[in-house]
Amino acid sequence: MPTLVLIRHGQSQWNLENRFTGWWDVDLTEAGIAEARAAGKLLADRGFQFDRCFTSLQTRAIRTLHLVLHELKSLWLPVTKDWRLNERHYGGLTGLNKQEMIDQVGAEQVKIWRRSFDIPPPPLGADSPYQLADDRRYAGVVIPETESLKDTIGRVLPYYSAHIVPALLRSERVLVSAHGNSLRALEKHLSNIADADIVGLEIPTGQPIVYELNDDLSVRDRYYLRER
């Protein structure tokens, strides 16, 4: 039976500081490290094993995956990293404090930028300190200046179909460590969630989400492992 486990990275430094992170690379906090280790221990205690892993090019997701695999005694597993599993790009909001933005432009505008399905934030300025044009990991990648959730889905799902689906069709057990919005993209597809509803789906940090799949990859069951 194909099994897909999704996990959002543990708490990052900018999660703690309530800042828009997007594609900017920040590491886990001590609490985030503990979350990742606890997730790995939970998976190990429940007897989970994996054949293949996928993650983004961002440190917080990569480190979470490594911490989980360490608890599973499975650091040797093949891991594929790809920018298409990155977090949604928050454009000109990158690095800004969410509450300070609410104070400046109002809660409704910030809600539109954060939670609308197809309205992106303002683009990242050419002179922003958060530009990634010189970041070697994105060599050859056309880096977006901003993204809506719809844009994020537009890169995540083709990657899922091309790279993760073939592994699942071989009945491999797959672990994906990624981000709130890239995981929303996968959950929307797997659980057939409407555009209007997916923006309200909250995905907590460091909590394994288990998808038990039929051979045709239809969903047999979906649950948070901590609840079983």
Give the predicted meaning of each segment.
Residues 109-151:
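Short glycine/proline- and acidic residue-enriched helix-loop micro-motifs
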Residues 3-9:
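Short, hydrophobic/glycine-enriched beta-strand segments
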Residues 7, 105, 178:
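A conserved hydrophobic position in a structured secondary element of the catalytic/binding core
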Residues 4, 62, 76, 150-219:
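Active-site-adjacent alpha-helix immediately C-terminal to a catalytic or transition-state-stabilizing loop
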Residues 40-127, 188-212, 216:
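Phosphate-coordination/substrate-recognition cap region in phosphate-metabolizing enzymes
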Residues 223-228:
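Short, solvent-exposed aromatic-acidic interface loops
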Residues 16, 111-114, 221-222:
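Short, hydrophobic secondary-structure boundary micro-motifs
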